[in-house]
Structures are given as structure tokens and as C-alpha cells.
């Protein structure tokens, strides 16, 4: 009798842990929407600050994270509700289109424009009048460097350098 109970208990433990690990996996994949958005913004700030070598690795992080996020949403691994809870609204409103790469292009464009606007067209989150938009290249560079530093962009880059999930062959 004991020998029968042990395998049954083991099976029950395994079966009960599957939904939890699936939910954890879905949560991690849902968070990739934010990683993608942030990486694309950081790539833009790196570019604007004259740090061109940081642009490509951050772009790749955004591309890989975004692709995994979109594929998880499309396959149903991540529900629409979970995606809306974990990913920025700017990402979740752009999830309609013919292909994953099309959606990634839309997200990249939107994140880049948002990052640019935060440097050139906004002050403390408030949109400036067009006459007050910044056009001084050095000031733009300085503000972009500050955003890059304050936006934890180096942490995304370090993840790539340390061999994290987003490590690319070109690094």
C-alpha cells in the first residue's frame, strides 16, 4: 500500500506545480513587453547622446524581448489581461497587425518617438509649446545622456554583457 501511495503523491505534487510554473512563465513573458519598450527607448537615448555602440545591443534586446512577448500573446500563453497589467499601454495598443515583425516595427517606432519627445518636446513630463522645443544639439545630447543613466539603460546593457537571456552573438 505504501508503495502505491508514494507514486500517487508524487504525481499529485507534479500536477499541482504545473499550473504555478505555467503562470510564472506567462508572467515572465508578459514582462518582456516592458523590457522591449524600455530597450527601444534606451537605444534611442544612446543614439541621441552620441553613444552609437550602445544602440545596436539595446535594439537587439528590444527585438528579442518584443518578439517573445508578441509570440506569447498571439499563442495565448499571455492573456490580454496579463499583457495589459505588465506591459506599457503604448505596447498593448500596438498589438494588431499582420506579423510579429510588423508589430515590432510599430513598437520600435513608437518607443523611439516617445524617447525623442521626452528629450526635445517635454519638460518634466509636460509637452512644451513648439517654440520651446529644444534644438540645441549639445543640450539634446546632455539630456539624452541623463535619460540613459536615469532610465537604467546600463542595466539592460549589462544583462547582455553578462550573458543573460538577451545575449547576442555580436557581443
Residue ranges and their predicted role:
Residues 4-17:
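Bacterial N-terminal signal peptides
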Residues 20-31, 126-133:
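Short amphipathic alpha-helical segments and their helix-coil junctions
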Residues 23-54:
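Immediate post-signal-peptide N-terminus of mature secreted/exported proteins
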Residues 47-81:
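N-terminal, post-signal-peptide region of Sec/Tat-exported proteins
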Residues 67-171:
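Compact alpha-helical subdomains of small soluble proteins
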Amino acid at each position: 500500500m505504501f508503495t502505491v501511495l508514494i507514486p500517487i503523491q508524487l504525481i499529485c505534487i507534479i500536477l499541482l506545480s504545473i499550473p504555478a510554473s505555467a503562470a510564472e512563465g506567462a508572467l515572465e513573458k508578459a514582462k518582456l513587453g516592458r523590457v522591449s519598450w524600455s530597450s527601444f527607448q534606451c537605444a534611442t537615448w544612446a543614439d541621441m547622446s552620441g553613444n552609437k555602440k550602445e544602440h545596436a545591443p539595446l535594439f537587439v534586446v528590444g527585438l528579442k524581448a518584443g518578439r517573445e512577448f508578441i509570440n506569447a500573446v498571439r499563442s495565448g500563453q499571455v492573456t490580454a489581461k496579463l499583457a495589459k497589467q505588465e506591459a506599457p499601454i503604448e505596447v498593448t495598443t500596438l498589438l494588431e497587425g499582420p506579423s510579429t515583425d510588423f508589430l515590432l516595427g510599430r513598437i520600435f517606432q513608437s518607443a523611439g518617438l516617445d524617447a525623442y519627445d521626452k528629450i526635445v518636446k517635454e519638460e518634466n513630463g509636460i509637452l512644451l509649446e513648439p517654440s520651446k522645443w529644444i534644438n540645441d544639439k549639445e543640450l539634446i545630447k546632455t539630456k539624452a545622456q541623463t535619460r540613459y543613466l536615469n532610465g537604467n539603460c546600463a542595466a539592460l546593457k549589462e544583462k547582455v554583457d553578462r550573458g543573460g537571456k538577451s545575449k547576442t552573438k555580436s557581443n
